């Protein structure tokens, strides 16, 4: 168990320091909120249940009986909440002898920063692992797959041939999204909402979606993606995505990627009677995952 003592903050025990740096930087806005829908929970876990619905109605011949269809349960997605916690200990002497900002308050700010960064990484890792076969969804497939099982056969939310971010690949992805069906193969209105990219693709994404004319050509054609308003929620740059050429599209499908907040971040402190050391801790509990894979489409890049 690590403890902050006077030896670890020796410079803070003497007057004359001009500045202390390394723990106070500007932060990005909470980017994880662009990646998931947020719900609350008051249980140990949450479950989402797929229901399959009915197929097309057949022709009924004169005098023939009606064909009766059946609806059934599909996949069950379980969200088991995990606790994330971190703390630190400071000796009584280190607190009393520090000549500058109250060291407990300063370190508490660092603790809050660590908790926020943790949530950013936990949520972004669903995207970072979207093509990783070690991380499967309730249907037994990776988040972005060409082989999501359904009653009407395998379905896809990624291109058959992986492609880098371009006007053509985005158009192909939008077509793929527009052809999505439910588990029974019925047409459903799935629409792109936002384009999610790592910082490495920020400028390329802006050129593709914000140019008035077709991007990267001498043609006078319109920028169809822009003129048709294909991404009404715009470009979302996420600094926690690790693949420099992967890109993702969130859709309007409900019950896609989720974060269930079980317990909000809380902070506490206490003093040890025997040592007079002060303990500070942060604690938060939540779960992440996805139910309907149609909530996301994407490509790992070529």
Residue positions per predicted region:
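Charge-rich, acidic-biased intrinsically disordered regions
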Residues: 129-149
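N-terminal alpha-helical "arm" segments
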Residues: 1-28
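Sequence/fold signature of self-assembling virion shell proteins
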Residues: 2-11, 143-182, 187-194, 200-302
